[in-house]
């Protein structure tokens, strides 16, 4: 019902050295023991670099990849298409295309349409960087559309297959219930459940984000609050302070989650 995505931005993937990245992937695949699907986050390198990384990930047991365009090459649309075409031809596992605001490398709908001819491009992680949120769902019968913007309910209504979230690995019953409600078309209940957690958590993100950047800061706070700390952020990104952690524990407790005592 869920996928373990390793070394994407929330997992500090862009900050990992190559040997760390593949040690992490190897450990995750071994720990999963064929009980979960493992997807690795890759990006930013040129075509040759990405293909080398993708082949290694495939050999280590990843069943798919999340891949962003080579943003530092400032590629044009035809070059983005060629990048994914070359990658698709070089591997035998699935690729989820991903681009977000802030990368300054948008992918336009016509380029997504042309990707339909690429055998191993199987999913699009969608946050409507350009155009309207609904646009991508014209391709819902071609690709697995994965929401990347708190739009799980709308995604399901429009034919999407899943959503990115910050919480399924923190307290799985919450997001599994959200998606179950969506599949049963109990959309109002699903949205209310999402909002009951995302609303309070967004306030924590806002408070922490005013002091330090980085996508992993609150994520690491969440794991620590639930009794599974996974280490500090990588510099120069900071960590949650005690006041922020107290607020986070209060929020999670208010959501009814089993937060262990901090004493």
Model regions and ranges:
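Catalytic alpha/beta core domains of metabolic enzymes, predominantly
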Residues: 101-204, 208
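Active-site beta->alpha loop and helix N-cap motifs at the rims of alpha/beta catalytic domains
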Residues: 1-104, 237-238
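Structural recognition of alpha->loop->beta junctions
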Residues: 58-64, 90-93, 114-123, 230-231
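A general structural signal for well-ordered alpha-helical segments in protein cores
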Residues: 21, 25, 50, 133, ...
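Conserved, mostly hydrophobic/aromatic
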Residues: 28, 57, 87, 124, ...
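C-terminal alpha-helical cap/extension of soluble enzyme domains
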Residues: 1, 171-263
């Amino acid at each position: 019902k869920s996928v373990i995505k390793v070394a994407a931005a929330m997992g500090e993937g862009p900050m990992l050295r190559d040997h760390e990245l593949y040690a992490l992937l190897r450990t995750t695949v071994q720990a999963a023991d064929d009980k979960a699907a493992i997807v690795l986050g890759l990006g930013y390198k040129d075509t040759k670099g990405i293909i080398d990384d993708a082949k290694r990930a495939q050999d280590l047991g990843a069943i798919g990849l999340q891949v962003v365009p080579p943003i530092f090459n400032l590629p044009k649309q035809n070059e983005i298409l060629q990048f994914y075409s070359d990658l698709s031809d070089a591997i035998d596992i699935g690729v989820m295309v991903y681009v977000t605001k802030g990368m300054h490398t948008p992918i336009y709908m016509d380029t997504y349409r042309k990707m339909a001819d690429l055998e191993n491009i199987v999913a699009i992680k969608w946050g409507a960087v350009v155009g309207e949120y609904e646009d991508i769902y014209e391709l819902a019968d071609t690709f697995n559309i994965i929401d990347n913007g708190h739009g799980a309910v709308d995604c399901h209504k429009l034919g999407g297959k899943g959503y990115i979230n910050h919480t399924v690995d923190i307290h799985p019953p919450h997001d599994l219930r959200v998606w179950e409600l969506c599949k049963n078309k109990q959309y109002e209940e699903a949205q209310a459940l999402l909002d009951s957690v995302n609303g309070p958590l967004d306030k924590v993100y806002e408070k922490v984000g005013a002091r330090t950047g980085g996508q992993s800061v609150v994520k690491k706070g969440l794991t620590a609050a639930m009794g599974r700390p996974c280490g500090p952020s990588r510099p120069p990104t900071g960590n949650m302070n005690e006041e922020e952690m107290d607020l986070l524990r209060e929020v999670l407790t208010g959501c009814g989650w089993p937060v262990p005592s901090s004493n």
